[in-house]
Amino acid sequence: MSFEERSKAAKEFQDKLFADLQAMGFNVALNGTEHTHPAFVSELHRSEDQTSMAIRYAPDGVACIGKIPRSFYVEAKFARTIERNAWIQYGKLVEAGNILVIVFGWENNTVFNFYENIKLIPGEISGLRYPAESRYPVEDGWIYPRKSKLWDNSKSPKASGTPYKEVDLNSLIPFSEFYKEIVNRLRVEQCPSMTSNISFSA
């Protein structure tokens, strides 16, 4: 699949995901700056200061539910991998007390989990599926395509080649459980003093 085909498939996956969430009763809005301010974020593609990185890797959407709504971030990934920079920025978002759900899709499979429950496979392990001469370099468990001569010879002109890890599929939940898992999490996270004021449709 070419870069353009992957991009098109990823956009279709995200659109369907957000439509599915709306159908479940969630109110959903776009959040990622590549959707809301594409010209602005394109100027930041090489910026690595913290604010620019947070902007570049903002989750794709935000969603809420309830009479007095509670909210969460949602990221749509049409892949089984996570970029290192994205993972770090997601972690900072969660460390600040935010809820982030990442939904993965590929080959008609849709699965998800909360950021903190997702496990990543060290590159030293996932790389064992390939012959030694076909493996990319690994540093601190992250795979670095750009640091290999293989990348120079085979890369797509639009592919990023940034460090990544594969996601452990055993740490993900079937999408059919999404509504239940999210609503239960939002109930747990609410302040006890506000329990009588928050009502969910579940």
Where are the regions a protein language model picked out?
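Compact nucleic-acid interaction/catalytic patches
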Residues: 80-86
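Structural beta-sheet core signal
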Residues: 73, 101-104
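Non-catalytic C-terminal interaction segments of nucleic acid-processing enzymes
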Residues: 23, 49, 64-69, 86-99, ...
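Conserved catalytic cores of phosphodiester-cleaving nucleases, focusing on short active-site segments
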Residues: 59-80
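Acidic carboxylate-rich catalytic motifs and surrounding loops in phosphoryl-/glycosyl-chemistry enzymes
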Residues: 32-35, 103-108
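Intrinsic disorder/low-complexity signal
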Residues: 4, 59, 138-139
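Acidic-basic catalytic patches of nuclease active cores, encompassing PD-(D/E)XK
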Residues: 1-50
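A short catalytic or substrate-binding loop motif that flags glycine-/basic-rich loops and adjacent residues
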Residues: 53-56
